[in-house]
Curated annotation (Swiss-Prot):
NCBIfam families: PLP_SbnA_fam. The keyword Metal-binding does not apply. This is N-(2-amino-2-carboxyethyl)-L-glutamate synthase. Pyridoxal 5'-phosphate binds at residues 73, 181-185, 268. The keyword Transferase applies. The modification N6-(pyridoxal phosphate)lysine is found at residue 43. Catalyzes the synthesis of N-((2S)-2-amino-2-carboxyethyl)-L-glutamate (ACEGA) from O-phospho-L-serine and L-glutamate. Pathway: Siderophore biosynthesis. PANTHER family: CYSTATHIONINE BETA-SYNTHASE. Homodimer. PROSITE patterns: CYS_SYNTHASE (PS00901).
Length: 338
């Protein structure tokens, strides 16, 4: 099949059994490789879905200025889609944006609007949204994607990965285990799969320091999981359990995934691996689990896959100062893991 544009290559990602990480006699774990989308992440799906439906219905006009609060994957996905659709795009970002993501956005020609003031939760999300509202007020024709409250976010995953997983598996899964941030992914896929498998148990994987499920805000560094603000989309009734994973454990989960499966994935994928480990540790029977690996590891070379960064995170968790070479706390290097 010949695609008309790179946007038409979004979706249809493979579902892979993680048979080297998990013994099939104790668990079958299937992971959808969303990092294989053209712009490198699961966020390609809502970016395409929201833009194309907006253009089709007229809520987005040709040449419209699209604005979104994102320092990561959605910003990159929107930059790609807007480039193909002839739209102008500005990403509202904060100081936590990685140098790699900033360079990618600029390569796509995206505008960059940066905030520096922290919000009431100690993060930047509220401040970024405030800046978005200011931009909309000064440019009435602009359109805010609003991944936190736009129902087309979860609809894109309902009709995307949800449909694809339902078609791919020959029998029901016991659990859906997914990282959560805006909550669009987990809600969309859970709602679709529960049509097929009403007994499906949905487990959200959240970051330590995230406020999504009522915990107090705290420091966290990895993007793509957790939030400093509860999104309008979040419906806790669709979620059965929540597992919190900190940055260090998530990074170690990524390294295990790379070591055992050869899958070079981003931080939230490692958090999911850790969550599945915890679930299986208390399982009383073999389980069939479905998950997603949302993005590529290349965007985390300065964090998850950097030994000095990992040593700093380990020191913070231990409450002291430590380097990667410190004898007081052994932090395995990437070479040791591999």
């Amino acid at each position: 099949m010949i695609a008309k544009s790179i946007v038409d290559c979004i979706g249809g990602t493979p579902l892979v059994q993680l048979a080297r990480l998990y013994d099939g006699r104790k668990a079958e774990v299937f992971a959808k490789l969303e990092m294989l989308n053209p712009a490198g992440s699961i966020k390609d799906r809502p970016a395409r879905y929201i833009i194309e439906r907006g253009l089709a219905e007229g809520s987005i006009a040709p040449g419209t200025h699209i604005i979104e609060s994102s320092s990561g994957n959605l910003a990159i996905a929107l930059a790609m889609v807007c480039r193909i659709k002839g739209l102008r795009f500005t990403a509202v970002v904060d100081p936590k944006i990685s140098p790699t993501n900033l360079k990618i956005l600029r390569c796509y020609g995206a505008g960059i609007e940066r905030v520096t003031r922290k919000d009431s939760q100690g993060g930047y999300l509220e401040t970024r949204i405030e800046r978005v509202r200011q931009m909309l007020a000064s440019e009435p024709g602009a359109v805010w994607i609003n991944q936190y409250g736009n129902p087309r976010n979860w609809e894109s995953h309902f009709h995307g990965e949800g449909d694809e997983i339902a078609r791919a598996l020959d029998r029901p899964a016991d659990m859906l285990v997914l990282g959560v941030s805006t909550s669009g992914t987990v809600l969309g896929i859970a709602r679709r799969l529960r049509r097929e498998w009403p007994g499906l148990r949905v487990v959200a994987v959240d970051a330590v320091g995230s406020v999504l499920f009522g915990a107090k805000p705290g420091p966290r560094e990895l993007p793509g999981i957790g939030a400093s603000r509860v999104p309008e989309l979040l419906c806790r009734d669709d979620i059965d359990d929540v597992i919190h994973v900190d940055d260090y454990d998530a990074a170690m989960g990524c390294r295990r995934l790379l070591e055992r499966e050869g899958i070079f994935a981003g931080g939230s994928s490692g958090a999911v691996v850790v969550a599945i480990d915890r679930l299986l540790a208390r399982a009383t029977r073999p389980l069939r689990i479905v998950t997603l690996l949302p993005d590529r590891g290349e965007r985390y070379l300065d964090s998850v896959y950097d030994d000095e960064w990992l040593a700093r995170i380990a020191a913070s968790r231990a409450g002291g100062a430590v380097s990667a070479a410190s004898p007081s706390l052994h932090v395995p290097s990437l070479e040791e893991v591999l």
